[in-house]
Amino acid sequence: VSFKHRIILLSLVSLFSIFTLSYFLLTEAQHSLKNAESLEKSVILSTKISELVHELQKERGRTAGFLGSGGKTFKKELQEQRKLTDLKIKELEKYLNKEYVSSLSGEAQKLFLSVILNGLDNLSQVRVKVDSLQISLEDAINFYTKLNSDLIDSVALLAKNSKNAEIANELLAYTNFMYAKDKAGLERAVLSVAFANKMFPDSKLFTKFVDLLAQQKAFIKSFSLAAPERVIDFYKKTVVSSGPSEQVLNYERLALTSPFTEGALNVDPNQWFRIITQKIDLMHKVELFIAKDLIGKIKEVKLEAKSRFNGVLVVSVVAIAVILIVSIASLRVRGE
Protein backbone atom coordinates (compact mmCIF):
# COMPACT_ATOMS: atom_id res chain seq x y z
CA VAL A 1 0.00 0.00 0.00
CA SER A 2 1.46 3.32 -1.09
CA PHE A 3 2.07 6.21 1.29
CA LYS A 4 -0.68 8.21 -0.44
CA HIS A 5 -3.20 5.44 0.12
CA ARG A 6 -2.12 5.07 3.76
CA ILE A 7 -2.65 8.81 4.33
CA ILE A 8 -6.06 8.68 2.67
CA LEU A 9 -7.07 5.60 4.69
CA LEU A 10 -5.83 7.13 7.94
CA SER A 11 -7.68 10.37 7.15
CA LEU A 12 -10.91 8.52 6.38
CA VAL A 13 -10.70 6.52 9.62
CA SER A 14 -10.01 9.70 11.60
CA LEU A 15 -12.83 11.57 9.88
CA PHE A 16 -15.23 8.69 10.47
CA SER A 17 -14.28 8.59 14.16
CA ILE A 18 -14.70 12.37 14.49
CA PHE A 19 -18.03 12.32 12.62
CA THR A 20 -19.33 9.47 14.78
CA LEU A 21 -18.21 11.04 18.05
CA SER A 22 -19.52 14.46 16.97
CA TYR A 23 -22.87 12.97 16.00
CA PHE A 24 -23.37 11.38 19.41
CA LEU A 25 -22.14 14.46 21.29
CA LEU A 26 -24.26 16.84 19.19
CA THR A 27 -27.31 14.60 19.55
CA GLU A 28 -26.86 14.53 23.32
CA ALA A 29 -26.30 18.31 23.44
CA GLN A 30 -29.35 18.93 21.24
CA HIS A 31 -31.43 16.66 23.47
CA SER A 32 -30.29 18.63 26.53
CA LEU A 33 -31.20 21.87 24.77
CA LYS A 34 -34.68 20.57 23.89
CA ASN A 35 -35.18 19.45 27.49
CA ALA A 36 -34.14 22.90 28.69
CA GLU A 37 -36.56 24.58 26.27
CA SER A 38 -39.37 22.24 27.35
CA LEU A 39 -38.54 22.92 30.99
CA GLU A 40 -38.61 26.66 30.30
CA LYS A 41 -42.16 26.32 28.94
CA SER A 42 -43.18 24.34 32.01
CA VAL A 43 -41.78 26.96 34.37
CA ILE A 44 -43.46 29.84 32.51
CA LEU A 45 -46.71 27.86 32.43
CA SER A 46 -46.45 27.29 36.19
CA THR A 47 -46.13 31.03 36.82
CA LYS A 48 -49.18 31.74 34.65
CA ILE A 49 -51.17 29.10 36.53
CA SER A 50 -50.10 30.67 39.82
CA GLU A 51 -51.29 34.10 38.67
CA LEU A 52 -54.66 32.66 37.62
CA VAL A 53 -55.09 30.80 40.91
CA HIS A 54 -54.37 34.03 42.79
CA GLU A 55 -57.17 35.83 40.93
CA LEU A 56 -59.56 32.88 41.35
CA GLN A 57 -58.87 32.92 45.09
CA LYS A 58 -59.87 36.58 45.21
CA GLU A 59 -62.94 35.86 43.08
CA ARG A 60 -63.87 33.04 45.47
CA GLY A 61 -63.68 35.48 48.39
CA ARG A 62 -65.78 38.11 46.60
CA THR A 63 -68.30 35.46 45.58
CA ALA A 64 -68.59 34.26 49.19
CA GLY A 65 -69.24 37.81 50.36
CA PHE A 66 -71.82 38.40 47.62
CA LEU A 67 -73.74 35.18 48.30
CA GLY A 68 -73.39 35.49 52.06
CA SER A 69 -75.07 38.89 51.95
CA GLY A 70 -77.83 37.67 49.67
CA GLY A 71 -76.45 39.77 46.83
CA LYS A 72 -76.52 43.03 48.81
CA THR A 73 -72.77 43.62 49.01
CA PHE A 74 -69.63 43.01 46.94
CA LYS A 75 -71.56 43.21 43.64
CA LYS A 76 -69.32 45.86 42.07
CA GLU A 77 -66.14 44.35 43.54
CA LEU A 78 -67.11 40.91 42.22
CA GLN A 79 -67.64 42.20 38.67
CA GLU A 80 -64.27 43.99 38.74
CA GLN A 81 -62.54 40.89 40.09
CA ARG A 82 -64.02 38.72 37.34
CA LYS A 83 -62.39 40.96 34.73
CA LEU A 84 -59.00 40.41 36.36
CA THR A 85 -59.62 36.65 36.44
CA ASP A 86 -60.67 36.60 32.78
CA LEU A 87 -57.48 38.42 31.83
CA LYS A 88 -55.36 35.70 33.46
CA ILE A 89 -57.49 32.97 31.85
CA LYS A 90 -56.82 34.46 28.40
CA GLU A 91 -53.09 34.65 29.13
CA LEU A 92 -53.05 31.00 30.19
CA GLU A 93 -55.11 29.76 27.23
CA LYS A 94 -52.92 31.73 24.81
CA TYR A 95 -49.81 30.06 26.18
CA LEU A 96 -51.36 26.60 26.56
CA ASN A 97 -51.70 25.82 22.84
CA LYS A 98 -52.50 22.37 21.41
CA GLU A 99 -48.90 21.78 20.32
CA TYR A 100 -47.60 22.30 23.84
CA VAL A 101 -50.35 20.20 25.46
CA SER A 102 -49.58 17.33 23.06
CA SER A 103 -45.94 17.37 24.21
CA LEU A 104 -46.93 16.70 27.83
CA SER A 105 -47.27 13.29 29.46
CA GLY A 106 -50.62 11.51 29.21
CA GLU A 107 -51.48 12.28 32.84
CA ALA A 108 -50.63 15.97 32.45
CA GLN A 109 -52.52 16.20 29.13
CA LYS A 110 -55.63 14.73 30.71
CA LEU A 111 -55.53 17.13 33.65
CA PHE A 112 -54.89 20.24 31.55
CA LEU A 113 -57.65 19.39 29.10
CA SER A 114 -59.99 18.68 32.02
CA VAL A 115 -59.20 22.04 33.63
CA ILE A 116 -59.43 24.04 30.40
CA LEU A 117 -62.39 22.26 28.79
CA ASN A 118 -64.43 21.62 31.93
CA GLY A 119 -63.37 23.74 34.89
CA LEU A 120 -62.78 27.06 33.16
CA ASP A 121 -65.70 26.55 30.77
CA ASN A 122 -68.00 25.86 33.72
CA LEU A 123 -66.82 29.06 35.39
CA SER A 124 -69.12 31.21 33.25
CA GLN A 125 -72.11 29.01 34.17
CA VAL A 126 -71.31 29.26 37.88
CA ARG A 127 -71.03 33.03 37.60
CA VAL A 128 -74.52 33.23 36.08
CA LYS A 129 -75.89 31.16 38.97
CA VAL A 130 -74.08 33.38 41.47
CA ASP A 131 -75.50 36.57 39.94
CA SER A 132 -79.04 35.17 40.12
CA LEU A 133 -78.44 33.65 43.59
CA GLN A 134 -79.25 30.21 42.16
CA ILE A 135 -76.30 28.47 43.80
CA SER A 136 -75.56 27.86 47.47
CA LEU A 137 -72.55 29.44 49.14
CA GLU A 138 -71.11 25.99 49.89
CA ASP A 139 -71.45 24.78 46.28
CA ALA A 140 -69.88 27.96 44.91
CA ILE A 141 -66.93 27.77 47.31
CA ASN A 142 -66.46 24.07 46.52
CA PHE A 143 -66.41 24.81 42.78
CA TYR A 144 -63.68 27.44 43.09
CA THR A 145 -61.69 25.29 45.51
CA LYS A 146 -61.84 22.27 43.17
CA LEU A 147 -60.80 24.43 40.20
CA ASN A 148 -57.88 25.89 42.13
CA SER A 149 -56.86 22.44 43.33
CA ASP A 150 -56.83 21.09 39.76
CA LEU A 151 -54.73 24.03 38.58
CA ILE A 152 -52.22 23.56 41.40
CA ASP A 153 -52.16 19.80 40.73
CA SER A 154 -51.10 20.59 37.17
CA VAL A 155 -48.05 22.45 38.50
CA ALA A 156 -47.23 19.40 40.62
CA LEU A 157 -47.34 17.25 37.47
CA LEU A 158 -44.98 19.63 35.69
CA ALA A 159 -42.58 19.27 38.62
CA LYS A 160 -42.92 15.49 38.45
CA ASN A 161 -42.08 15.46 34.73
CA SER A 162 -39.06 17.76 35.08
CA LYS A 163 -35.72 16.06 34.37
CA ASN A 164 -33.75 18.72 36.23
CA ALA A 165 -33.71 17.73 39.91
CA GLU A 166 -33.00 21.23 41.24
CA ILE A 167 -35.81 22.86 39.27
CA ALA A 168 -38.16 19.94 40.00
CA ASN A 169 -37.62 20.44 43.74
CA GLU A 170 -38.30 24.17 43.51
CA LEU A 171 -41.42 23.55 41.43
CA LEU A 172 -42.53 21.11 44.12
CA ALA A 173 -41.92 23.79 46.77
CA TYR A 174 -43.85 26.25 44.59
CA THR A 175 -46.77 23.82 44.44
CA ASN A 176 -46.87 23.24 48.19
CA PHE A 177 -46.74 26.97 48.84
CA MET A 178 -49.65 27.54 46.44
CA TYR A 179 -51.64 24.89 48.33
CA ALA A 180 -50.86 26.58 51.67
CA LYS A 181 -51.96 29.94 50.31
CA ASP A 182 -55.20 28.46 48.97
CA LYS A 183 -55.96 26.97 52.39
CA ALA A 184 -55.32 30.40 53.94
CA GLY A 185 -57.95 31.78 51.58
CA LEU A 186 -60.44 29.19 52.81
CA GLU A 187 -59.55 29.99 56.41
CA ARG A 188 -60.36 33.63 55.64
CA ALA A 189 -63.90 32.62 54.66
CA VAL A 190 -64.42 30.22 57.59
CA LEU A 191 -63.36 32.65 60.31
CA SER A 192 -65.32 35.45 58.65
CA VAL A 193 -68.45 33.40 59.35
CA ALA A 194 -67.36 32.60 62.92
CA PHE A 195 -66.53 36.21 63.76
CA ALA A 196 -69.76 37.44 62.18
CA ASN A 197 -71.64 35.12 64.58
CA LYS A 198 -69.22 35.86 67.47
CA MET A 199 -68.83 32.07 67.79
CA PHE A 200 -68.69 28.98 65.60
CA PRO A 201 -72.31 28.20 64.63
CA ASP A 202 -71.60 24.45 64.62
CA SER A 203 -68.87 21.89 65.24
CA LYS A 204 -68.60 21.15 61.51
CA LEU A 205 -67.30 24.64 60.78
CA PHE A 206 -64.89 24.48 63.72
CA THR A 207 -63.55 21.13 62.52
CA LYS A 208 -63.09 22.66 59.07
CA PHE A 209 -61.10 25.50 60.64
CA VAL A 210 -58.84 23.13 62.59
CA ASP A 211 -58.29 21.00 59.47
CA LEU A 212 -57.33 24.08 57.46
CA LEU A 213 -54.73 25.07 60.06
CA ALA A 214 -53.26 21.55 59.99
CA GLN A 215 -53.19 21.49 56.19
CA GLN A 216 -51.46 24.87 56.00
CA LYS A 217 -48.83 23.69 58.48
CA ALA A 218 -48.23 20.49 56.50
CA PHE A 219 -47.92 22.29 53.16
CA ILE A 220 -45.56 24.92 54.59
CA LYS A 221 -43.40 22.13 56.05
CA SER A 222 -43.26 20.38 52.65
CA PHE A 223 -42.46 23.71 51.02
CA SER A 224 -39.60 24.32 53.48
CA LEU A 225 -38.11 20.87 52.83
CA ALA A 226 -38.04 21.34 49.05
CA ALA A 227 -37.32 25.06 48.65
CA PRO A 228 -33.78 26.48 48.31
CA GLU A 229 -32.44 28.44 51.27
CA ARG A 230 -32.81 31.85 49.58
CA VAL A 231 -36.53 31.21 49.02
CA ILE A 232 -37.07 30.10 52.62
CA ASP A 233 -35.24 33.19 53.88
CA PHE A 234 -37.43 35.43 51.71
CA TYR A 235 -40.56 33.68 53.01
CA LYS A 236 -39.52 34.12 56.64
CA LYS A 237 -38.58 37.76 56.13
CA THR A 238 -41.67 38.62 54.08
CA VAL A 239 -44.42 36.56 55.72
CA VAL A 240 -43.46 34.90 59.01
CA SER A 241 -42.03 37.99 60.70
CA SER A 242 -44.70 40.35 59.33
CA GLY A 243 -47.30 42.22 61.38
CA PRO A 244 -50.28 40.66 59.55
CA SER A 245 -48.99 37.14 60.29
CA GLU A 246 -48.71 37.93 64.00
CA GLN A 247 -52.24 39.36 64.04
CA VAL A 248 -53.64 36.36 62.16
CA LEU A 249 -51.97 34.06 64.69
CA ASN A 250 -53.65 35.95 67.56
CA TYR A 251 -57.06 35.63 65.88
CA GLU A 252 -56.47 31.90 65.36
CA ARG A 253 -55.56 31.41 69.03
CA LEU A 254 -58.74 33.20 70.07
CA ALA A 255 -60.84 31.01 67.77
CA LEU A 256 -59.20 27.84 69.12
CA THR A 257 -59.57 28.88 72.76
CA SER A 258 -63.29 29.74 72.84
CA PRO A 259 -64.96 28.32 69.75
CA PHE A 260 -68.46 27.71 71.11
CA THR A 261 -68.79 30.33 73.85
CA GLU A 262 -71.48 32.76 72.79
CA GLY A 263 -70.04 36.23 72.22
CA ALA A 264 -66.44 35.08 72.86
CA LEU A 265 -65.30 35.73 69.28
CA ASN A 266 -66.02 39.44 69.48
CA VAL A 267 -63.99 40.39 66.42
CA ASP A 268 -65.03 42.62 63.55
CA PRO A 269 -65.20 40.19 60.58
CA ASN A 270 -64.20 42.99 58.19
CA GLN A 271 -61.10 43.65 60.27
CA TRP A 272 -60.24 39.93 60.18
CA PHE A 273 -60.82 39.81 56.42
CA ARG A 274 -58.54 42.82 55.89
CA ILE A 275 -55.71 41.47 58.05
CA ILE A 276 -55.61 37.96 56.60
CA THR A 277 -55.88 39.41 53.10
CA GLN A 278 -52.72 41.38 53.86
CA LYS A 279 -51.01 38.14 54.88
CA ILE A 280 -52.23 36.36 51.73
CA ASP A 281 -50.94 39.24 49.61
CA LEU A 282 -47.54 38.83 51.27
CA MET A 283 -47.68 35.12 50.45
CA HIS A 284 -48.34 36.10 46.84
CA LYS A 285 -45.11 38.13 46.94
CA VAL A 286 -43.32 34.91 47.86
CA GLU A 287 -44.98 33.17 44.89
CA LEU A 288 -43.69 35.93 42.62
CA PHE A 289 -40.22 35.59 44.15
CA ILE A 290 -40.19 31.83 43.52
CA ALA A 291 -41.41 32.38 39.95
CA LYS A 292 -38.64 34.91 39.29
CA ASP A 293 -36.07 32.58 40.83
CA LEU A 294 -37.27 29.65 38.70
CA ILE A 295 -37.22 31.68 35.49
CA GLY A 296 -33.69 32.90 36.27
CA LYS A 297 -32.56 29.36 36.97
CA ILE A 298 -34.06 27.92 33.78
CA LYS A 299 -32.36 30.66 31.75
CA GLU A 300 -29.04 29.49 33.18
CA VAL A 301 -29.84 25.86 32.31
CA LYS A 302 -30.86 26.84 28.78
CA LEU A 303 -27.74 28.99 28.30
CA GLU A 304 -25.54 26.15 29.53
CA ALA A 305 -27.23 23.71 27.11
CA LYS A 306 -26.77 26.13 24.19
CA SER A 307 -23.12 26.69 25.11
CA ARG A 308 -22.54 22.94 25.28
CA PHE A 309 -24.15 22.41 21.86
CA ASN A 310 -22.19 25.26 20.26
CA GLY A 311 -18.98 24.09 21.93
CA VAL A 312 -19.33 20.54 20.58
CA LEU A 313 -20.16 21.91 17.12
CA VAL A 314 -17.12 24.20 17.03
CA VAL A 315 -14.72 21.52 18.31
CA SER A 316 -16.08 19.03 15.76
CA VAL A 317 -15.67 21.44 12.84
CA VAL A 318 -12.15 22.41 13.97
CA ALA A 319 -11.13 18.75 14.41
CA ILE A 320 -12.40 17.84 10.94
CA ALA A 321 -10.66 20.87 9.43
CA VAL A 322 -7.36 20.00 11.14
CA ILE A 323 -7.49 16.40 9.89
CA LEU A 324 -8.19 17.55 6.33
CA ILE A 325 -5.45 20.20 6.41
CA VAL A 326 -2.86 17.80 7.86
CA SER A 327 -3.80 15.09 5.36
CA ILE A 328 -3.61 17.42 2.36
CA ALA A 329 -0.34 18.93 3.60
CA SER A 330 1.17 15.45 4.07
CA LEU A 331 0.18 14.41 0.56
CA ARG A 332 1.69 17.57 -0.92
CA VAL A 333 4.95 17.18 0.99
CA ARG A 334 5.20 13.55 -0.13
CA GLY A 335 4.40 14.57 -3.69
CA GLU A 336 7.26 17.06 -3.75
Say what each PLM segment does.
Residues 1-335:
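Hydrophobic alpha-helical segments
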